[in-house]
Amino acid sequence: MYDYHQPDLAGHFGIYGGSFVSETLTHAINELKDAYARYQNDPKFLAEFNYELKHFVGRPSPIYHAARMSREQGGAQIYLKREDLNHTGAHKINNTIGQAMLARRMGKQRIIAETGAGQHGVATATICARYGLECVVYMGSEDVKRQSPNVYRMNLLGATVVPVESGSKTLKDALNEAMRDWVANVDNTFYIIGTVAGPHPYPMMVRDFQSVIGTECLSQMPEMNAGRQPDAVVACVGGGSNAMGIFHPYIAHENTRLIGVEAAGEGLDSGKHSASLQRGLPGVLHGNRTYVLQNDDGQVTETHSISAGLDYPGVGPEHAYLKDIGRAEYVGITDTEALQAFHYLCRTEGIIPALESAHAVAYAMKLAKTMRSDQSILVNLSGRGDKDIGTVADLSGADFYDRPSMRGLGVKGGVATSPESFDASGAKGAGSQS
């Protein structure tokens, strides 16, 4: 069993983490650290948090045995932790509830957040609506285009969505703008960061709120898996909050492999990916030291992923630490492989996953073939794919207009063909990229 106690009092996970912020934010960070230290083990705070998780979110989320997929892939049995069934459709709500509760106790009435895929923005807007808090969400304009359903959901919930036009117009830039807002409005504003990154105490705090995922799995998996824990836990990694939420309770279980799946984009050697743990170097980004995709001059480089939620040049510092000590492994899945897994899960199990989650599903499908049938893989299905339908339709060349029902037929570019002419990606001749 691992003896694991991280971070230290200064928020360091080995050489990673810490708090690198402007002088303007030092007081706000210290105020947040003090508040979290006060409430993180407070019985009333925890009772309210658990009440919200049960009655508002709908926890515990179930574990589902993907039996048909397991049979077709061969090898290990594949199980899915169904975070997609949470209220708002992803794991993000676990964290936003905890931080919003903390904000109320600190007397903050204005909430800001950053979002990539839009799920954290929706979760933040949702809890702000529930608690009657002002909500402003920063989102890269590129992500606004590819995640438009979530933008409208945020508007319906009363949030102001601010498109960010700087840089690559994605998650990194949204986080930069949110930080600027916090500096300008520090007295009345609470920043709900959506991932296990940022200055201390955010990586620890977000991990703690998300650890409900793995804690539930510890009791659920033996019921599903003949009394045993999984041989491997697989989760997608952008900033890394869903992965850390399921990994952390399993760190002490050294017979369970922890595997994080990064966005390999067009290939790890293409320069068009978001795989900071595999191609990055240690550096400081958004208030913490971690692995960062950067050039020889230390400038943060542009990233790419089919998935807006994984399109980020850094990663949570605890993931960096787990990589260095060898407790977790990190691999890459390309856009094409993720898209194939997206279609395959839809058609095999009747579950539409988020494109982020599809990266984890894709790797689990590969991994299962290398394992025995009496072994098991637990995949964190971090979110549902409603938000990605437009992106997937565009990439598949689907045309939803001016045609009769195509039930039972494959569709590409509005032309019906037999299902046999399509592979698991839903596109003729599509193959995985190396």
UniProtKB/Swiss-Prot annotation:
Q: Which residues carry this modification: N6-(pyridoxal phosphate)lysine?
A: K92
Cofactors (names): pyridoxal 5'-phosphate
Extract the InterPro entries matched here. Answer: Trp_synth_b_CS (IPR006653), Trp_synth_beta (IPR006654), Trp_synth_beta/beta-like (IPR023026), TrpB-like_PALP (IPR001926), TrpB-like_PALP_sf (IPR036052)
* Top-level lineage group: Bacteria
Pfam annotation, one family: PALP
Reaction catalyzed: (1S,2R)-1-C-(indol-3-yl)glycerol 3-phosphate + L-serine = D-glyceraldehyde 3-phosphate + L-tryptophan + H2O
Q: Kindly list the GO CC terms recorded for this protein.
A: cytoplasm
Which keywords does this Swiss-Prot/TrEMBL entry list?
Amino-acid biosynthesis, Aromatic amino acid biosynthesis, Lyase, Pyridoxal phosphate, Tryptophan biosynthesis
Cited CDD domains:
Trp-synth_B
**Matching PROSITE patterns:** TRP_SYNTHASE_BETA
**Which EC class does it fall in?**
lyase
Sample GO molecular function, one term: tryptophan synthase activity
- Enumerate the transmembrane spans: none
What pathway is this protein said to act in by its record?
Amino-acid biosynthesis; L-tryptophan biosynthesis; L-tryptophan from chorismate: step 5/5
Assembly notes? Tetramer of two alpha and two beta chains.
Its job? The beta subunit is responsible for the synthesis of L-tryptophan from indole and L-serine.
State the family named in the UniProt similarity comment for this chain: Belongs to the TrpB family.
Q: What is this protein called?
A: Tryptophan synthase beta chain
Encoding gene (name): trpB
